[in-house]
């Protein structure tokens, strides 16, 4: 004979800790979201205001199943039941031994019918291949209950499905591309992949905030209670369950991170983030590659990307499963109507969220627009209007100046600055972009004096570009007060010096002539929508 209890506080649940964990250990559970530590930590932080009710099914006084639910009463006095952790738990299921799963589910649903008469079940995160999902559907069919199911794909790597060599071979093009990013970044400084203790979690949240500051983020990952949740979760780790945070650091500065929930043979990737200033170097791909190989070396069988249709989740996968949203109601008119409305809403939502281009438009472009409207100053508005106008019609006239080679040794030496030297500067995003394009920076102390490129001359406003001769350097963003010293500094290497000045900057052109430059060419660029024409006039 089966019986049940309703647990409404953590104190009431504590005596069942060993039974709960024992069932999961016996069933070799690898779903981190139903581990006792995850559930109780969520309840104590994020779910403190929810009406949590954990239904325990007992057989002869021994707990054989746990249903971790949130119970509310809504319109028409209909009772709503859903799994706890909604919005934070990707997967959820009933905690029960396989032999008791069917009986426990059938029993508790009959209890709902007798006790509440009219109810609506909304169970999210059901793993399609697991027993909970199958038994719920079986019950609905057997008792002819109105129900609907929505599926979302879940991609993962099964390291036992192929050898590491075969995996590397299958993705050799992707690995080759990542290696190029890694090699290029290492040219600028030291790169380090390392695990992180809870005392450094604040850096993870700071980086995530920077990553999403211009996007629409609904994850609530950086909210105060969510931070507290993950910090507490990291402190309750055990042999079966633990939180791992890894960072990719460039010269001691975080440029990407991963936070994983590890449960027995499964490594679930909870969240990733990277420094937007380093987008050109692919920091997200770099740390994902390192994290996957680490998971394999640590003995995990599964590397789980979670549910969703984001393209990056299908870059590496070997297998897929599905997570279900299961909606079932009793047969009354009101609850059937509400269920039908929920089904319609979820179908529309599914069509929209499965369209990745539409998701990007809303998340990225709309996010950038809202960020701009909130933070833009007069200068940014003027720059925007100028940019819009120049996309339609624009005329640019620029003058090219050259200072010929000299071997004068009376120069003022400037120190070459490396990427690590500019990591704390406000202009870091622009400087990193210039480093990536092959520019070099020179300065006096911590003050940047000029930027130099030895292969290409580039004018940012007009987009004009041309290749330099073998013994010529292009300088830009120079300190006009030190222009003579800059020229001598470059010329001492036996190189000519090239720069560009727009026609309306008379003072700069005079400074260039005083420093030994002479104008060699005038370029006029005309743009009308996508049509573009260059006119060259030799001097």
Region spans (language model):
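Hydrophobic beta-strand segments of well-ordered beta-sheets in folded domains
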Residues: 92, 117-125, 465, 470-475, ...
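A conserved beta-strand-loop-helix scaffold within acyl/acetyltransferase catalytic domains
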Residues: 2-85, 124-154, 158-280, 426-475
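Residues at or immediately flanking beta-strands
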Residues: 120-122, 192, 302
């Amino acid at each position: 004979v089966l019986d049940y209890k309703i647990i409404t506080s953590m104190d009431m649940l504590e005596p069942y800790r060993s039974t709960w964990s024992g069932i999961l250990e016996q069933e070799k559970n690898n779903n981190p979201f139903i581990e006792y530590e995850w559930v109780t930590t969520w309840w104590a932080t994020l779910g403190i205001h929810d009406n949590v009710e954990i239904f325990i099914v007992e057989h002869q006084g021994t707990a054989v199943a746990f249903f971790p639910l949130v119970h509310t009463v809504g319109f028409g006095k209909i009772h709503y039941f859903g799994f706890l952790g909604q919005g934070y738990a990707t997967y959820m299921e009933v905690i029960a031994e396989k032999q008791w799963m069917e009986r426990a589910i059938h029993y508790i649903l009959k209890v709902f019918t007798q006790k509440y008469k009219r109810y609506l079940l909304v169970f999210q995160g059901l793993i399609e291949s697991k027993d909970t999902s199958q038994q719920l559907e079986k019950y609905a069919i057997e008792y002819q209950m109105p129900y609907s199911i929505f599926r979302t794909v879940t991609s993962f790597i099964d390291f036992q499905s192929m050898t590491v060599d075969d995996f590397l071979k299958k993705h050799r093009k992707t690995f080759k591309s990542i290696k190029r990013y890694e090699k290029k970044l290492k040219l600028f400084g030291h790169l380090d992949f390392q695990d992180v203790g809870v005392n450094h979690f604040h850096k993870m949240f700071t980086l995530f905030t920077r990553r999403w500051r211009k996007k629409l983020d609904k994850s609530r990952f950086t909210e105060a209670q969510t931070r507290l949740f993950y910090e507490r979760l990291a402190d309750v780790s055990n042999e079966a369950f633990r939180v791992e945070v890894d960072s990719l650091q460039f010269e001691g500065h975080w440029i990407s991170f991963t936070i994983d929930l590890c449960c027995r043979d499964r490594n679930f990737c909870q969240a990733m983030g990277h420094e937007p200033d380093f987008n050109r170097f692919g920091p997200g791909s770099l740390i994902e590659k390192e994290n996957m190989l680490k998971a394999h070396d640590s003995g995990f069988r599964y590397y789980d990307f979670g549910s969703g249709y984001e393209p990056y989740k299908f870059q590496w996968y070997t297998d897929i499963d599905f997570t279900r949203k299961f909606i079932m109601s009793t047969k009354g008119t009101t609850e059937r109507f509400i269920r039908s409305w929920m089904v319609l809403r979820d179908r529309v939502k599914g069509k929209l969220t499965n369209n990745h281009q539409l998701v990007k438009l809303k998340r990225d472009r709309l996010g950038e627009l809202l960020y701009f409207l909130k933070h833009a100053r007069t200068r940014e508005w003027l720059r925007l209007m100028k940019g819009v106008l120049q996309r339609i019609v624009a005329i640019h006239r620029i003058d090219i100046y050259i200072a010929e080679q000299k071997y004068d040794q009376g120069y003022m030496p400037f120190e070459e600055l490396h990427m690590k030297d500019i990591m704390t500067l406000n202009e870091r995003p622009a400087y990193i972009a210039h480093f990536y394009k092959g520019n070099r920076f020179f300065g006096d102390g911590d003050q940047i004096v000029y930027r130099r490129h030895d292969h290409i001359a580039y004018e940012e406003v007009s987009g004009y570009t041309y290749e330099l001769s073998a013994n010529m350097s292009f300088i830009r963003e120079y300190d006009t007060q030190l222009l003579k010293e800059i020229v001598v500094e470059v010329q001492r290497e036996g190189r000519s010096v090239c720069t560009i000045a727009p026609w309306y900057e008379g003072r700069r052109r005079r400074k260039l002539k005083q420093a030994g430059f002479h104008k060699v060419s005038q370029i006029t660029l005309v743009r009308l929508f996508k049509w573009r024409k260059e006119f060259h006039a030799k001097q």
